[in-house]
Regions:
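Formylglycine-dependent sulfatase
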Residues: 27-28, 35, 41-234
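Accessible peptide chain termini
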Residues: 1-2, 234
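Short, intrinsically disordered terminal tails adjacent to the first/last structured region
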Residues: 2-4, 114
Length: 234
């Protein structure tokens, strides 16, 4: 029996937050609204396009929007300036697999069996919100890292829980450790494949900054070690 995606305010378990800026309803606010309010008024006829972007193994202070002078994130800053900027947010797990499974199912890791453990499997019984969007008429897909690491096939799923994969386009990375997946070109392929003005939902799972450490990479990036802010717990 399918475990339904929860139709409550807990449908977005990735954060318990206060936010400092809320202006135009851009991509982030659209996503939050879509996840928190899956049952919309019948009077609403238009369906907003949704672009979900998630980095891998990144702590919240490491963005210039949060005041970091070492890490420059102009794209993230633009979203923060025109949407919502959270300053008290929490993930449900420090591991990739369970954290992403929580996002996809709207449930805590302890509620989703194997999907709540790292690098395991993803039981087919649990509904994922991309599938619900597809049922509602959306064209869905993902590039980069979707749900993982783990084996989603073993439970009988026909595709990654994040949606159909768009990872064919590749590039020559500028630095060692940077993914060779061409996120933007894969997104263009996705848009080309949809029918007309069909509403879309697309997951961009950047593998960065979770990558092997490269000796003296800070010198190549013209950074100074003395500018690194070490967390107090280290």
């Amino acid at each position: 029996m399918k475990r339904k995606f929860p139709k409550t305010l807990f449908a977005l378990p990735i954060c318990s937050s206060t936010f400092t800026r809320m202006s135009n309803k851009h991509i982030l606010s659209t996503l939050v609204s879509s996840l928190l309010i899956p049952q919309v008024s019948a009077a609403v006829t238009s369906k907003p396009n949704i672009l979900f972007v998630i980095s891998d193994d990144q702590s919240y202070p490491h963005a210039s929007a949060y005041g970091s002078s070492l890490v420059k994130t102009p794209g993230f800053d633009l979203v923060a300036q025109n949407g919502w900027l959270f300053n008290n947010a929490f993930v449900t797990s420090p591991g990739s697999s369970p954290s992403r499974a929580s996002i996809l199912t709207g449930l805590y890791p302890w509620q989703i069996e194997e999907a709540g453990t790292h690098a395991s499997s993803f039981p087919i019984d649990y509904e994922c919100f991309p599938d619900l969007l597809e049922e509602a008429g959306y064209y869905i897909g993902y590039t980069g890292k979707g749900w993982g690491p783990g084996n989603w096939k073993i439970s009988g799923r026909r595709r990654n829980p994040a949606g159909p994969e768009y990872n064919k386009r590749r590039i020559r990375p500028p630095y060692k450790g940077i993914s060779n997946i061409n996120y933007s070109q894969n997104f263009k392929d996705f848009l080309h494949d949809r029918e007309g003005k069909q509403p879309f939902y697309f997951w961009v799972g950047a593998n960065e900054p979770h990558r092997p450490y490269e000796k003296d990479s800070w010198e190549k990036a013209d950074k100074r070690l003395v500018d690194v802010e070490v967390p107090p717990f280290l």
